[in-house]
Structures are given as C-alpha cells and as structure tokens.
C-alpha cells in the first residue's frame, strides 16, 4: 500500500487540520493509501519517514521557508512531491502584496520544487495559471473536505431569515468588521447576528458591536452542527478565501450562504448562495436588508456524499498520475 506523508507546520484547530483528519480517516482513501500526518517545524520540514512513497506539503510558503523547501526536495530527489496551496489567492494578493514581482517570484520558485501543485478551488487554479505561477500541466484542483455527515440530519430552516450566523476565525480576512458595520444599518429589531469563533480581532469586533443587543459572540463552536442548526442564514463577507469550507458545511446543513464575490467562494455560488457584488458596508447592508424576512431554506440541498466524492475522486486521480509516471526530481521551469 502507498504511504503518503502529509506535512503540516500549523496544528491550530481549523480547516486544514480538519481536512487532514478527513484524509487520514476516510475508508475509501484508506483502501488506496496510508495517509500519515507529520507535524514539522516552521521553515524546517524534516522528519519525513524514509519509506514515504509520496510527500504532500500543506506548509506555509514564505521567503524564510524557501531554503527548507529546497532542502526537502534535495533529501527526497526520487520521491514525488505535491504542494497544496491553502493560503494564497487572487484576493489575498490584491490586499496584502506590496511587491507583485517579488511575491510571484516566491511562488514560482517554491512551486517549481514540486511534481504537482494542488489548488483548492477552480478560481484559485485560474489565478495561478493566468499569472504563470504554476505550470498548467502540473496543476490539479481538489476541494478540501471534512466529515459532513452530522450536518445532513439538521432540519432545514423554516420561515423567514431571522437568525444570522458568521462562523470562522475572528480576523481581518473574514471581513467581520465590515459585516458588523453593515448589520447595524439594518433596521430590523427581530434580526440577530451571532459570531462563532475566536481570534485576534475579537476585541475590535466587540467594540464595533457595542450598544447593539442583536449582535452576539458565542465563542469557538465545539459542536459546529449546533451552530448551523441554530441559524437561518450563514454569512461570509471574506476579503479573500481560497476555498471557504464553511459554505460547504452550511449548504449540507440546508442553509444558504450570503457571500463575497472572491476567490473560491465564487465556485460555491451555483448551489444557491447569493453573492454580494461589492466589498463595501453599503452593499452588505443592502444585501442583508433584502434577504431579511425572505424564506430561509436552501432550494437544492447538497448531500455530504456528493461533496465528499469530489474530493476523494480528485485524490484518487492525483495518486494514479503520480504512481504511473516517473517522479520528476529536477526543478520545473517557471
């Protein structure tokens, strides 16, 4: 059986760690390969088992980490290596990159060390391809997934939208500051907004919400199913979002997601999720006003199996490619 070493340098509870748990525990994937999760030091990815048949990087890409990536490639010249890009996207680059040339040089240099690069959404893959950051013939798209079966048992929301949930890490990326400002402009006393999550922006968000009793902070959702069950609508005003796992979870739970028009969220709009076209307080206030009071139920509720199958099929296809062609130990040309 194939032995796959998934390297991770951040074990903070979140989407990536839950995704790796899914890969490690899924029985169908387990029939093809033994997926092992290896925690490594930031910028120093060592300790890969000598008998690993394939190495998969879920590591942060940075200039500080590039020498470690080069060393990893040098130590495993005959082993196929894959990088999964969880962090960077077009939306991220637009808001956080001051030197486009330098940033793109970093990505090209890093990705060239790997036999395959996995994007987590079609939108992210399109950005990588358009900018020549990864060779198209080495680029795959595999959406991340977690176990969604518990969400299928949640009853669909009945009646109009009244209880809105914002689920995720409390930081600038998620756009929750803009959401609070927009929500406070909606003059509906029966509408509530509950945040599920923790993060560095908590104090800032509490200050923005002060004086509006409709806005609540519930902390980290130990039981995500309960958070979805207690809501009529989920909102994702993200400034950038390579994929957006919360949208998949909400849809399986029968909830629509009001979302930003960025990155991987665009891939999930066809499931019946309305998009807010502009990243402004005014646009979000208008969207919230229009959706409040409307029927809450998602018209076409996806199954956990359908979303799970897309991820598993992607990995099966990727492993077939890697095991049926010689590993390319030499660097790709950018």
Residue ranges and their predicted role:
Residues 129-130, 140-162, 231:
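Acidic anion/phosphate-binding donor-loop and adjacent secondary structure
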Residues 220, 239:
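Aromatic "clamp/platform" in nucleotide-sugar-dependent glycosyltransferases that forms part
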Residues 99-117:
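Membrane-proximal helix-turn-helix segments that form the acceptor-binding/catalytic region
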Residues 57-66, 84-88:
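Short His-centered aromatic/hydrophobic patch
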Residues 112-138:
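A short, active-site helix/loop in glycosyltransferases that binds the activated sugar's phosphate group
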């Amino acid at each position: 059986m194939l032995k796959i070493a998934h390297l991770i340098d951040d074990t903070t509870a979140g989407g990536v760690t839950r995704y790796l748990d899914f890969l490690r525990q899924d029985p169908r994937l387990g029939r093809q390969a033994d997926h092992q999760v290896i925690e490594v030091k930031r910028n120093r990815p060592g300790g890969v088992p000598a008998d690993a048949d394939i190495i998969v990087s879920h590591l942060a890409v940075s200039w500080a980490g590039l020498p470690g990536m080069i060393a990893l490639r040098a130590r495993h010249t005959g082993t196929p290596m894959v990088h999964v890009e969880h962090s960077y996207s077009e939306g991220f680059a637009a808001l956080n990159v001051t030197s486009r040339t330098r940033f793109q040089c970093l990505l090209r240099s890093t990705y060239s060390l790997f036999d395959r690069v996995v994007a987590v959404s079609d939108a992210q893959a399109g950005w990588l391809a358009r900018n020549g950051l990864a060779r198209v013939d080495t680029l795959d798209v595999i959406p991340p997934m977690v176990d969604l079966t518990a969400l299928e048992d949640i009853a669909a929301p009945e009646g109009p939208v009244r209880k809105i949930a914002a689920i995720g890490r409390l930081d600038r990326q998620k756009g929750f500051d803009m959401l609070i400002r927009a929500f406070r402009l909606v003059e509906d006393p029966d509408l509530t907004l509950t945040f599920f999550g923790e993060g560095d922006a908590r104090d800032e968000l509490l200050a923005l919400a002060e004086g509006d009793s409709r806005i609540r902070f519930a902390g980290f959702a130990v039981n995500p199913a309960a958070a979805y069950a207690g809501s009529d609508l989920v909102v994702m005003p993200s400034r950038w979002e390579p994929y957006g796992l919360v949208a998949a979870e909400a849809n399986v739970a029968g909830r629509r997601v009001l979302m930003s028009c960025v990155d991987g969220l665009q891939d999930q709009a066809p499931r019946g999720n309305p998009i807010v076209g502009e990243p402004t307080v005014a646009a979000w206030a208008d969207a919230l006003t229009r959706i409040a009071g409307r029927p809450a139920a998602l018209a076409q509720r996806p199954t956990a199996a359908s979303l799970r199958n897309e991820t598993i099929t992607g990995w099966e296809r990727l492993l077939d490619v890697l095991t049926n062609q010689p590993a390319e130990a030499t660097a790709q040309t950018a």
